[in-house]
Amino acid sequence: MLNCKRLVLLLVLWVAASAAAQQPYMPNSFHGLESEGEIPADLKKSLRELYNEDKQRMRDYNDGRLKNRDMVLAVSYNINRLTSNGRILYGDPITKTIERIADTLLKDYPELRGQLRFYTVKSASVNAFATGQGMIFVNLGLVAQVENEAQLAFVIGHEIIHYYRKHTWEEVSRNRQRASSPEQQMQHFLRYHHRSREMENEADSLGLTLFYINSPYDKRVSEGIFDVLQFADQPFGQVEITRQLFDSPYYKLPDSYFLNQVTPVTPRDYYNDTLSTHPDLQSRRKHTSHILQGTQGGEAYVLTTPEQFEQLRLLARMECIRQDLIYGQYTRAYYNCLVLLQQYADNPFLISAKAQALYGLAKQKTYTGTMAVEHYEDFDGEIQQLYHLFGKLKADEASLLATRELWAAHKKLPTDGYIDHMCQDMLQLLYSKHAMNPKDFATTFDTAARHPASDSSSTPDGKYARFKQKQHTASSTFNPKYAFTDLLQEDTTFSRWLNQYMTAANPAKVGPSSDKGVFLFAPGYFVTDLKDGGIKYRKSDHQEELLPTMVAQAAKGNNLTTTDFSDPTLRQHDDAQFYNDFVALNEWTNEFWQTRGAVPKCMSTQPQMDQLIARYGADKLSLNMVANAEYYQKVSALTGIGAMMFGTMLFPLMPLTINFLASNKEMTTTYNYFIDTRSGRVLDKNDNIINYRDSKALVTNSIYSNIYKGMNRRAPIGYMGKRLSVSVNGALDFPLLKLLYFDRISRAVEFRPSLNVEYTLNKTKSLSLWCDYLPTRMWVESNPDELIANMTDLFLTWRHYLNGNTAPLGPYWGFGATLSHVALSTQEQANGSQMALRYLKNHYLIPGLQIEFGRNYIFGNKIVFNYGARYTLTLANPFKPEWDNTNIGTTSRQEMNETRTRRSLYGNIWMTNLFVFSLGVGLLPL
């Protein structure tokens, strides 16, 4: 008998364990839905792979012809963005149920079933859509709103038809217009999912006749599912918003914060929803009812029980609330918590989420004002009252209510450290932002203030007395000093917290840890063509794949390691753990991005982020986006002529003038945020707009500077912190210019090697020291033969780099001083003869002034390539004097010949150094 009982007990335990294994998500321990199993191939495909597959699909649809190649690429790009946005679920209980429903609907179509993959999207919108690639996405918002399994099956069957009938490729085949602006790009993306009325009717008809009618599901589905779609913008239920939800015994909100009545919920049958994927609900409802007329039978639940489906729906609803907290939809999150708490009063997640919503609202109002709440007239039903109330709340009132809500959550969940952290933060906020301190809050209520003594000179029931009574009541009950009176009376712990955390002792900001690495997460790169319009998808994708390497190099330059969560890295992993971490980092980043760090707060996703910090040893995040706009600027004839005249007048600028007229114009904008992931505090951010192409060096250095400033609180000096560059140059000068001065020249162009050392002073300025050597020949007056001249020039130049570029990267201009050493000899002297120079010395030192223009390119963060032009004004008089009979007597012929010869030499040096064009290559050693 005992053995039998033991056997029964073991059997019960085994069943319980099996049930627990099948239900890993228990509502009372909910922290968010996660994916399970190996990462599907759909989520790891590159744009290149997807585009090649889509081109073949388009050929198959059009009898071998590839129509609208650009639109096919746009479809591939948008799907690639969708599958890598970190909001896709796979292998979780909801997705598995959707897959099982599809198995049931397609039991007679195994080939079609094999072509389909199903995923759930972490989105609160009520929607589902199919793609031409065989992926069907169901938003959690739809699962959260459907009433039973049959309604979900109807929607799935509908979406299967969109794939089966190739509606995506039909739309692409018809559409020939390319979007020419970001707004039109979004319209095209929405239109890609926006089917025509005929397609919707076809999906309804065939979905019913091919799949649904032959399934075991309830044939009375049409009314229920279209009710769900009709009221898709409504919360999970209706709960009346009364002042009792917010008033305390001694502190009440003004009557003006509450509407006399709310706008009744209006049907959406006739709503012209041009951005909806499934418009015209009324006609679809009638059409579906007509098809199902005469059919009967079926069950609302086939694969699940009502209790199991309710649990799945609850998971979807809680995840929707969680997503609303992430994306700053605090009013909707709070209201849906109220709805669910009516049934699940002790659910820890709902209690915490309700407090988080009010906490987030108070923080938003404190730091951003009225932007925190949407206008209440945009909503109907009972939730309208909550939008009105939250919109009316002042920042200090919202903070007081949030503190009360957090304290109530703390009492229910005393071991939840995250709630404690928010409560303590809110008490500090009351002190620092709203100038409140513990002494401001009364422990007893002044009843005399609430019930003023009657005036013997007036009638107690008179209307003026009632006005005065209302005024006195308002002045007491709306007074924030009574906001915590009941808590102070009932709980000494609250009084202790008030005194401990509502003080000037603001926790010191802890700097970033130098021994922990940097999270590299999904950097974005967008290249647009402003001439043809739209995004250059393939170039954007290619550059985006290179961007993680640039971030890693920038971090390495700051002696930091990187933990790479970019899309290319995701494709190299198979395990769900990495994918779920990718999603967690994405959610934390999205929550941060709602305010871009302008609202310091305890983020709802911080517990997940803390786990990532511990797992990967990184506590900083580098967020990076690059936008490059290409445009071919047509130069007018007048502008071109003017530029050429300018270049001719200032001959050294001629190469740059030609480059301006011939080159493609680009503008590059880099956005970089360096964030402390322990607190969400922005350590540094920079937005740079540069009217040049998006070189790797430019982007890498902007990220490096962002990280450097975040770690050191000061700007770096020099490209990637390197202050010294050394280069070897080959320069060309043009003796041809001597024809302006002499009637003969030795050669037209001369080569002069040079060495350049450049030292960076600050971000945009540097000192450059040049030394070049030129063996040349000169025709000098009074010397019948060519003279051999060995010129050594030193140039000390102050440089300024343009458009915010960091020295020594990018275009520059400079000015400085020169010193030319000229060693002269004759051909005979070179051959060993002692024949002297006539009227000249063997050595000359001649100073000068210089201006220069150039540009440096940097490759691999080490190699420098440069080109430039410099113009030198030699400080020696090159003009030969003329003597007449009046002064010939006072000047000896010897002196006259010496002067003319010397100035002839100066003329040679002038023209030799007048214009020099150089090309060089060097290194950044330090």
List each model region and its residues.
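A Zn2+-metalloprotease active-site environment signal
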Residues: 22-507
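C-terminal/domain-edge helix-coil "capping" segments
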Residues: 200, 490-520, 525-531, 602-605, ...
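Outer-membrane beta-barrel translocator domains and adjoining extracellular loop/strand segments
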Residues: 237-239, 636-640, 738-744, 779-785, ...
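Short glycine/proline- and aromatic-enriched beta-strand/turn motifs that initiate or cap beta-hairpins
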Residues: 524-533, 712-774, 914-926
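N-terminal segment of the mature soluble domain
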Residues: 532-625, 677-686, 763-766
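Gram-negative (and chloroplast) outer-membrane scaffold detector with strong preference
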Residues: 604, 759-851, 857-863, 921-926
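Residues that define the transmembrane beta-barrel architecture of outer-membrane proteins
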Residues: 666, 722-724, 747-753, 786-794, ...
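Predominantly the C-terminal beta-signal and adjacent terminal strand-loop region
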Residues: 776, 789, 854-926
